[in-house]
């Protein structure tokens, strides 16, 4: 097993509090004073703006608090019913390749979705993980179920991924998610496959080694 910590927060964590904790931990990792960390949590309802966010994509600026953040990407929604995964890995000890890291995140999400019989796919022109809506007999309709937004600071990763378990999907209407128009957002619940956070978290953790373990492309250097 890799030398890495896992933390699951049972209570919702305020956004700025989480960012502060993450930045402090990343600083300690950079100095070799702390182990890598994968942190699973939920936030209260909010919109976060990545470094490429366009103000026109914020359709309802007064609906929820809006936070500017250093991660890549555009606007996204976070809130109850969504599993947030903040990933703090030291790529100096792994593979210093940002594209390979993002690819590993995508594959990790897709692998986890498959454990619940949901077929997630990536798209070269659209960030995130997508599903074809065969559940409503609309195979040509694609909705996003997982989002990715990262930052790399001195080769230590920040931010990470979010997967829609059972959020209020109407809350996404206040933004154009990730600046991508013409596509919807879905969740496990929306697709008729409600699950418990515990079950999702266990499958996510079980799949970590496959994509970030010692024998993976993003594994620790020997």
Can you name each region flagged by the protein language model?
Residues 1-145, 194-198, 222:
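N-terminal lobe of the biotin/lipoate ligase/transferase fold
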Residues 47-48, 155, 170-171:
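Short, acidic Gly/Pro/Ser/Thr-rich loop/turn segments
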Residues 130, 169-222:
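C-terminal accessory segment of soluble enzyme catalytic cores
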Residues 150, 155-156:
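Acidic/histidine-enriched ion/cofactor-binding microenvironments in catalytic or ligand-binding pockets
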């Amino acid at each position: 097993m890799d030398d890495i910590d896992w933390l699951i927060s049972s209570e919702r964590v305020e956004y700025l509090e989480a960012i502060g904790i993450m930045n402090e931990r990343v600083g300690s990792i950079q100095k070799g004073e702390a182990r890598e960390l994968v942190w699973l949590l939920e936030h209260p309802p909010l919109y976060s703006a990545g470094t490429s966010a366009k103000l026109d994509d914020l359709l309802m600026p007064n609906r929820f608090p809006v936070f500017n953040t250093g991660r890549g990407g555009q606007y996204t929604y976070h809130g109850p019913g969504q599993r947030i995964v903040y990933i703090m890995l030291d790529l100096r000890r792994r593979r210093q390749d940002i594209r390979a890291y993002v690819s590993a995140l995508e594959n990790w999400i897709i692998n986890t979705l498959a454990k619940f019989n949901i077929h997630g796919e990536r798209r070269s022109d659209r960030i995130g993980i997508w599903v074809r809506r065969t559940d409503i007999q609309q195979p040509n309709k694609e909705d996003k179920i997982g989002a990715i937004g990262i930052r790399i600071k001195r080769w230590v990763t920040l931010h990470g991924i979010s997967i829609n378990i059972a959020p209020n999907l109407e809350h996404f209407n206040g933004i154009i998610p990730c600046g991508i128009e013409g596509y919807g957002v879905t969740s496990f619940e929306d697709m008729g496959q409600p699950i418990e956070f515990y079950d999702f978290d266990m499958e996510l953790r079980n799949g970590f080694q496959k994509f970030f373990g010692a024998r993976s492309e993003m594994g620790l250097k020997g």
